[in-house]
């Protein structure tokens, strides 16, 4: 098991919190975000700044958006949506959708084509509505109470 550096992330998190909001964020954009070190199966950032790319799914206001983290490895295709960007293959982690502050946004990568974005949105809606594809309680690592 990989050791998580919560202390280093806490220092970065403090400076992230002090940043101004990023008002230039829009739906369909792919950005590097400061994800940090998270708990359990929550997706972590990587590299020395604990960052990773994510797709902006929905912008609520200047400070708050829904994002979908990306990865280059999909373990179970039921929980990931594949897309190609800049000649590379990525997977959107459907189970990791989250609300984040625009203070976490570091640098813009680009804009996902509308046809791909519409496909991703449709997949998110279908994923949320179709609960039988959720990981079964038997595969959960957490013991039953």
Report residues per predicted region:
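C-terminal terminal-subdomain/extension
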Residues: 1-10, 23, 83-145
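Short alpha-helix capping/helix-loop boundary micro-motifs
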Residues: 14-21
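Preference for short coil/turn "hinge" residues that link or interrupt alpha-helices
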Residues: 18, 76, 102-105
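Short, charged beta-turn/beta-strand-edge "cap" motif at the junction between a beta-strand
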Residues: 36-41
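Compact nucleic-acid interaction/catalytic patches
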Residues: 43-87
């Amino acid at each position: 098991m990989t050791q998580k550096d919560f202390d280093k992330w806490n220092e970065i998190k403090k400076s992230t919190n002090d940043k101004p909001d990023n008002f230039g964020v829009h739906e369909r954009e792919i950005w590097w975000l400061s994800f940090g070190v998270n708990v359990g199966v929550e997706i972590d950032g990587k590299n020395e700044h604990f960052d990773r790319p994510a797709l902006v799914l929905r912008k609520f206001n200047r400070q708050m958006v829904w994002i979908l983290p990306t990865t280059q490895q999909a373990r179970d295709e039921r929980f990931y949506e594949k897309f190609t960007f800049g000649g590379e293959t990525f997977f959107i982690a459907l189970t990791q959708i989250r609300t984040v502050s625009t203070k976490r946004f570091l640098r813009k990568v680009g804009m996902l084509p509308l046809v791909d974005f519409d496909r991703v949105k449709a997949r998110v809606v279908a994923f949320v509505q179709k609960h039988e594809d959720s990981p079964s309680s038997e595969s959960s690592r957490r013991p039953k109470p």
